[in-house]
């Protein structure tokens, strides 16, 4: 996959701290939300047939401002191995610091969990490897104190956690391009889950962001 694959997606760190609190809920365990931010083509594909997503990276002043504003948000990032390795090759570099300084600082600073059965260590700053069952570990993470959880890329994880009903919110960017073929974001999901559209925003580059919650 190209290094630019998730530059657009990783720029929008829109998950913010949203923990429950207050004296009236002191005995209730904190709950962290799990969100997804990803891009799809106009014909509904998450990647093309070669697993490339560089088509999702479209420069535009309005879009860039949106990315920079949201890059200061707090989240714990969640990845699959392929997405993690690609991110880890780019965001700690001088090129990332020069071209997208705010996003690079956020990506390097935030806590990161990568789910993998093959990785033994994760060298990117503030990263850890989780080899436990995906759904079990996500349930555990959501029950612990900390920033909300945000998945970037990682289509297989998104599909599995959607099937398990563990994702609370989806931010999906529809990019005005037709790929013709590829892989969908929800590959293999069964049961026809439905979602509620809670917000939309259109940008001058043609991107439309939809905020969805599970019905």
Where are these regions (language model features)?
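Portal/gating segments that form or line small-molecule/metal binding sites
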Residues: 5-14, 27-166, 176-215
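C-terminal segment of classical bacterial N-terminal signal peptides
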Residues: 17-23
